[in-house]
Amino acid sequence: MSSIWPPQKKVFTVGFITGGVTPVMVSFVWPAAQPQKKINYSRKKKYFRPRSFYKKNVSF
């Protein structure tokens, strides 16, 4: 069992790094590659509109 544990830990750490760090890297790199104005418009469309829809659904 002791010989099996080190590879499992390595695989787990690699899976955690690829699954957790790469999305964060993309979230920082992708907006930086795009123009600032497009980022602002996309953020408003993605975040502000859904919130208004959620509020309307809750009120009904």
Swiss-Prot record:
Keywords: Early protein, Glycoprotein, Host membrane, Membrane, Transmembrane, Transmembrane helix
Known glycosylation sites: 40, 57
Induction: Expressed in the early phase of the viral replicative cycle.
GO terms for cellular component: host cell membrane; membrane
Localization: Host membrane
Keyword DNA damage: no
Lineage: Viruses, Varidnaviria, Bamfordvirae, Nucleocytoviricota, Pokkesviricetes
Naturally occurring in which organism (per UniProt): African swine fever virus (strain Badajoz 1971 Vero-adapted)
Chain ranges passing through the membrane: 11-33
Signal sequence region: none
Protein name, per record: Uncharacterized protein DP60R
Membrane topology: Single-pass membrane protein
